[in-house]
Swiss-Prot record:
Protein name (record): Uncharacterized protein YfjP
GO cellular component: cytoplasm; cytosol
Gene3D superfamilies found in the cross-reference section: P-loop containing nucleotide triphosphate hydrolases
Family of this protein: To E.coli YkfA and YeeP.
InterPro entries given in the database record: GTP-bd, P-loop_NTPase
Coiled-coil residue windows: none
Binding annotation for GTP: 43-50, 90-93, 156-159
GO biological-process terms attached to the record: tRNA methylation; tRNA wobble uridine modification
Lineage top rank: taxon: Bacteria
Length: 287
């Protein structure tokens, strides 16, 4: 179904408004449906960044980094399914080189404002976290804590390792201790996740948590780019709610424009709830 056909019910819900106002609202809703999220993924060498991305996301992947760019620039990859795009920024992990960490601090300060979310991968068997903690406090700081989702990766390597196809009770207990340790060290805004790509363990919960952590405008296109098993009811309903709330916020913003006459502002406020309901109803056609 074409976008203009999907927009028709929304247009009908705005029919009481002057044409230029309804067109402005529809234009912003259309832009919202084409929002391109940018997600950073960081972790030390061998943390499993690529395997996690491949496990979570579907779509065609194309590198977008300029080969002539500065070597300090992070690698960027663009994912596409249909009309939906997302960029993944591969950020270097800290704690492997003191000289590099100074460079990385500058890189992160430059990149953080542009990212919707950062997945910070910490290996289940990584005990050297002092540098990570320092970096989190000094570089990420209060301003961007809400953008960080900590993920314990390679949970199948938690002690005692067995190489089997399921996590043992002892491994799960040690993973729980690791989660508590990370909460204690970093005091993150969002709950810490734990996954094993090899065992396909914890990925659904992590995907749902990621959708909940994203800014409202970003959650729907990310859901559209998830592998099918992770497009769960929980993830989809969170994104649908976010989409409706964002459409409502668009109406609120337009109603505050200085050129909007008071009677038109009253109409916008009167139709807000019905427009949000329609937006939620047509979400499936967009995403």
């Amino acid at each position: 179904m074409k976008n203009f056909e999907v927009l028709q019910p929304l247009q009908n819900s705005l029919s009481g408004l002057p044409l230029w106002v309804s067109e402005r609202i529809l234009q912003q809703i259309n832009q919202l449906t084409h929002y391109e999220p940018v997600i950073g993924i960081m972790g030390k060498t061998g943390a499993g960044k690529s395997s996690l991305c491949n496990a979570l996301f579907a779509g065609e992947v194309s590198p977008v980094s300029d080969v002539a760019a500065c070597t300090r620039d992070p690698l960027r990859f663009r994912l596409q399914i249909g009309e939906h795009f997302m960029t993944i920024v591969d950020l270097p992990g800290v704690g492997e080189s003191g000289v590099r960490d100074t460079e990385y601090a500058a890189l992160y300060r430059e990149q953080l404002p542009r990212l919707d979310l950062i997945l910070w991968l910490i290996k289940a068997d990584d005990r050297a976290l002092a540098t990570d903690e320092h970096f989190y406090r000094q570089v990420i700081g209060e301003a961007y804590r809400h953008k960080m989702l900590f993920v314990i990766s390679q949970s199948d390597k938690a002690e005692p390792t067995s190489g089997g196809n399921i996590l043992s009770t002892e491994q799960k207990q040690n993973i729980s201790r690791k989660i508590c340790l990370l909460h204690e060290l970093f005091q993150p805004v969002h709950p810490v996740c734990a996954v094993s790509v090899r065992l396909q363990w914890g990925l659904r919960v992590m995907a749902e948590r990621m959708i909940k952590c994203l800014p409202r405008e970003a959650s729907s296109p990310v859901v559209a780019l998830l592998q099918h098993p992770f497009r769960t009811t929980v993830a989809r309903e969170q994104a649908r709610d976010d989409f409706g709330e964002t459409v409502g916020a668009i109406l609120d913003t337009v109603s505050t424009f200085p050129l909007i006459p008071a009677p038109v502002r009253t109409i916008i406020q009167a139709v807000r709830s019905s427009v949000v309901s329609v937006a939620r109803a047509v979400w499936d056609f967009f995403f």
